[in-house]
């Protein structure tokens, strides 16, 4: 067995952990962006419906 490789295992684990953390944070950021965009779209639709119902009442 190559013992030189085993010396680098902690470094490789730190790199793997960092990559995983970056991917998780990126995924969470994308989900937050999508949710905010969807909420803005829903608010816009509600405002349009409110305007249309006010027009019908008048």
Swiss-Prot record:
From the UniProt record, list the coiled-coil ranges.
29-58
Q: What is its main location?
A: membrane
Membrane-crossing ranges are: 10-32
* GO cellular component annotations of the record: membrane
Give the matching InterPro entries: SMIM11 (IPR042125)
> Which Pfam families does this UniProt record tie to the protein?
FAM165
| Tissue spec. comment | Expressed in heart, spleen, liver, stomach, muscle, lung, testis, skin, PBL and bone marrow.
Subcellular location per UniProt equals: Membrane
Say which domain of life the source belongs to.
Eukaryota
Q: Alphabetically list the UniProt keywords.
A: Coiled coil, Membrane, Transmembrane, Transmembrane helix
Question: What topology in the membrane does the UniProt record assign?
Answer: Single-pass membrane protein
What is this protein's record name? Small integral membrane protein 11
């Amino acid at each position: 067995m190559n013992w030189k490789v085993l010396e680098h295992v902690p470094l490789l684990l730190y790199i793997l952990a960092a990559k995983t953390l970056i991917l998780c944070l990126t995924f969470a950021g994308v989900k937050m962006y999508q949710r905010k965009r969807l909420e803005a779209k829903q608010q816009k639709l509600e405002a349009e419906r409110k305007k249309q119902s006010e027009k019908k009442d008048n």
